[in-house]
Amino acid sequence: MAKQTNKTASGTSTQHVKQQNAQASKNNFGTEFGSETNVQEVKQQNAQAAANKSQNAQASKNNFGTEFASETSAQEVRQQNAQAQAKKNQNSGKYQG
C-alpha cells in the first residue's frame, strides 16, 4: 500500500489537524476566561487600587510632618538651637591662643 502524502498511518490529514490547532490556539486565549471575567469591572478595580495607592502615599508623606507636631514647639527648638550655638561660640573663644 502506497503512503499518501500529508496523511498519518491512520489516514488523518496532518495539514487539516495543523489548521485546526492553529485556529483553536488563536481563539482560545482570549475566550478561555471570557465568561468568568468582567473586563469593565477589572478596569474599575485597577483604577480604584491606583487611586488608593496614590492616596496612601500622600497620607504617609504628610504623616511624617505631623507625627510629632503636637509634641514639638518649633519656637522652643529654635531657642534651644540658638543657646547651643551661643555656648559653642563662647567655648571656642576660650581655647583660642
Swiss-Prot record:
Sequence repeats: from-to residues: 23-56, 58-91
Keyword set, alphabetical order: Repeat, Sporulation
Cystines in this chain: none
Domain of life: Bacteria
Biased composition annotated in UniProt, kind: Low complexity: 43-63, 79-91
Residues of the site described as Cleavage: 32-33, 67-68
Pfam families on file: SASP_gamma
Keyword Nucleotide-binding: no
GO biological process: sporulation resulting in formation of a cellular spore
Region (Disordered): 1-97
Biased composition (Polar residues): 1-42, 69-78
Functional note: SASP are proteins degraded in the first minutes of spore germination and provide amino acids for both new protein synthesis and metabolism. These proteins may be involved in dormant spore's high resistance to UV light.
UniProt family annotation: Belongs to the gamma-type SASP family.
Name of protein: Small, acid-soluble spore protein gamma-type
